[in-house]
Amino acid sequence: MPRSVKKGPFVDHHLVKKVMEAQESGNKRPIKTWSRRSMILPDMIGLTIAVHNGKEHIPVYVSENMVGHKLGEFSMTRTYRGHAADKKSK
């Protein structure tokens, strides 16, 4: 069930503060965050945000297509290495 339009998008306050500081200073360094639940806002377009996946920070460059999605969608937490090969068929 999606979030109510009346409430507006959820973004952690500390992340909004860091985004505003990066825009004012014109700094292109990645913004480190653990907030995977925060929604991507139009203010974040063009910035690189390093999103934590449980082990390390994955750099995510924010483009127009990502607005409205959550940061965690672009930082995978699980690695899929494929199914085990069938040894009998060889």
Swiss-Prot record:
Q: Which GO terms describe its biological process?
A: ribosomal small subunit assembly; translation
GO molecular-function term, one example from the UniProt record: structural constituent of ribosome
Extract the SUPFAM superfamilies matched here. Ribosomal protein S19
Q: Which keywords fit this entry according to its UniProt record?
A: Ribonucleoprotein, Ribosomal protein, RNA-binding, rRNA-binding
Q: Transmembrane region positions? A: none
One GO location term (cellular component): small ribosomal subunit
Q: Does the keyword Ribosomal protein apply?
A: yes
Write down the InterPro entries for this protein, in alphabetical order. Ribosomal_uS19, Ribosomal_uS19_bac-type, Ribosomal_uS19_CS, Ribosomal_uS19_SF
One Pfam family name is: Ribosomal_S19
**What's the domain of life for this entry?**
Bacteria
Query: To which protein family does this belong?
Result: Belongs to the universal ribosomal protein uS19 family.
As for what it does, the entry says: Protein S19 forms a complex with S13 that binds strongly to the 16S ribosomal RNA.
HAMAP family attached to this UniProt entry: Ribosomal_uS19 (MF_00531)
This chain belongs to the protein called: Small ribosomal subunit protein uS19
Q: Could you tell me which species this protein originates from?
A: Hydrogenovibrio crunogenus (strain DSM 25203 / XCL-2) (Thiomicrospira crunogena)
Q: What taxonomic lineage is listed for the species of origin?
A: Bacteria, Pseudomonadati, Pseudomonadota, Gammaproteobacteria, Thiotrichales
